[in-house]
Design a protein with these regions (language model features):
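A short, GP-enriched loop/loop-strand-helix hinge that lies immediately N-terminal to
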Residues: 1-29, 44-53
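Conserved metal-phosphate-binding beta-hairpin within the catalytic cores
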Residues: 10, 116, 126-127, 186-197
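A general structural signal for well-ordered alpha-helical segments in protein cores
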Residues: 3-6, 31-34, 98, 138, ...
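Active-site nucleotide/adenylate-binding loops and adjacent lid/helix of ATP-dependent enzymes
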Residues: 27-121, 131-132, 180
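A short, local hydrophobic-aromatic micro-motif
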Residues: 18, 46-47, 139, 151, ...
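Phosphate-binding site of ATP-dependent enzymes
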Residues: 93-180, 185
């Protein structure tokens, strides 16, 4: 249901539900659409490129994509555009790892996202839609401290090496900026109900 299909079925059969609607769910699942929504809202993000399976499989089109990808520098993250739970994500540290990483992402989805790796922490908020026309609100941020190099599928579901710190150990000004940006991201995709951002 994360991609809007379940919401579409519920709407087509007049079954009430809570949370994101069809369009917001689709945008929230598709990382390239989500990045476009974030850009339109003025939210900062790392540089990235989209890679379609048909383009990567064509030597001339792949050659046309490579300069833009190489301009992102290393390391990179390569991930399926439409997948969750960190499935199919690879951290690319050397140029010769790129092809296998893109292939892994394209095995999960027809489009891959290639983005520069940021030296960042996993800070997240619970975000709640405003009621009665009120503003969107965000909780105090928490931090997920990964047990691996990055917060991957194994960290999320298999081993117990990651842990959470609530509240996140960040300066007050940063905490408020994280909350503001989390609300802006929620609103940018047309969020409804609540979400973890």
């Amino acid at each position: 249901g994360e991609d809007g299909v379940l919401q579409g079925l519920l709407e087509a059969t007049n079954v009430p539900y809570v949370g994101f609607g069809v369009a917001a769910s689709a945008v929230g699942m598709d990382k390239l659409l989500m990045k476009a929504a974030f850009a339109a809202a003025g939210l900062p993000q790392v540089r990235y490129a989209g890679v379609r399976k048909a383009d990567w499989g064509s030597p001339p089109r792949r050659a046309a994509l490579l300069p833009g990808i190489e301009a992102l520098g290393l390391p990179l993250f390569v991930k399926p555009a439409c997948a969750g739970s960190s499935v199919g994500i690879t951290k690319v540290k050397r140029a010769e790892e790129l092809d296998a990483a893109v292939a892994a992402a394209l095995a999960v989805d027809a489009t891959a996202l290639v983005e520069e790796a940021a030296d960042a922490r996993e800070i997240e908020c619970a975000v709640l839609e405003g009621t009665g026309g009120g503003p969107t609100e965000a909780s105090i941020p928490g931090e997920v401290v990964p047990g691996h190099e990055f917060y991957d599928y194994e960290d999320k579901y298999i081993d117990d090496r990651s842990y959470s710190v609530i509240p996140a150990r960040i300066p007050d000004a940063t905490r408020e900026e994280v909350r503001r940006m989390a609300c802006a991201a929620f609103d940018a995709v047309g969020g409804a109900g609540f979400a973890r951002v």
